[in-house]
UniProtKB/Swiss-Prot annotation:
Subcellular location as annotated: Membrane
Main localisation: membrane
PANTHER family: SMALL INTEGRAL MEMBRANE PROTEIN 12
Keyword vocabulary terms for this entry: Membrane, Transmembrane, Transmembrane helix
Membrane disposition: Single-pass membrane protein
Name of the featured protein: Small integral membrane protein 12
Domain of life (superkingdom): Eukaryota
GO cellular component, one term: membrane
Family label: Belongs to the SMIM12 family.
TM ranges: 12-34
Length: 91
């Protein structure tokens, strides 16, 4: 009888293994939730984008929005191209 049983188990292993694994997984899942209990949900967490937006608004509140740099001043601080880094600076 046992050789017939083991031959059938070996032949139909995928059909037997999946339901067994499913039952073991379901029992483990529910047991873990039973032991752990309901999770504590923290208060409303703000995302990184919202925090950044608030920080930027706070920075804007403290300064005069009519005083801005001219485009000529901004052009002086633009980095040189990567390919020109090793070239000698012409006087």
């Amino acid at each position: 009888m046992w050789p017939i049983f083991w031959t059938a188990m070996r032949t139909y292993a995928p059909y037997v293994t999946f339901p067994v694994a499913f039952v073991v997984g379901a029992v483990g899942y529910h047991l873990e939730w039973f032991i752990r209990g309901t999770p504590n949900t923290p208060g409303e967490e703000r995302g990184i984008a919202e925090l950044r937006e608030d920080r930027k608004l706070e920075e804007l509140n403290g300064r005069d929005s009519t005083q801005v740099l001219s485009l000529k001043d901004k052009l002086e601080f633009t980095p040189r191209a990567v390919l020109e880094r090793n070239r000698a600076v012409k006087s």
